[in-house]
Amino acid sequence: MSRKAYLILENGTVFEGKSFGAEKETMGELVFTTAMTGYLETLTDPSYFGQVVIQTFPLIGNYGVIPSDFESKVPSLRGYIVREWCQAPSNFRCEGDLDTFLKESDIPGIYGLDTRALTRIVREYGVLNCKIAYSGEVTEEELAEIKAYKIEQAVESTTISEKEEFKAENGDLNVVLMDFGAKHNIGCLLYTSPSPRDSTSSR
């Protein structure tokens, strides 16, 4: 049976759901995506570094985990919020389920809460800081800590450590990309370079 989990917003609002993925408390900026497909791309998109992401589409995980769909090698987000996750994924490329992937990536998730009501709050008030916790009781000190959260060292945490080459089947252009947290879906012969670099080091 899944453990109860709570999403605490910086304005004091608390949503109750159930835990999946890694069981750990975490804080982040609360954002949402309305994408109906591509949850693996969302999970591995470096632009979500430091954020807790809400999926508004009600069922997530139905085609499992497919590494070739990843936008980066590992997830950069801090937490993952869904209405329901599929416990029996089906796809000929599937290599695992969402719960196991989140556990292995040390990403906590919550399911079973009203993601659309939560999204309306974000739309009305803008980006809010939040905390994934396992107690619904909130102290003033805890709220102050949530409000003070800031995303730091995003580039340093998402850039690569050494140069890489990505080959495109039909690419006839060569591009050097300075990696400040780049995504993998680019249709050229691509060389990535760690950040920061001067112009001569990319040659």
Residue ranges and their predicted role:
Residues 2-174, 178-188:
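RNA-binding accessory domains that recognize and position tRNA/RNA substrates
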Residues 191-203:
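Single conserved hydrophobic/aromatic residue that forms the stacking wall/gate
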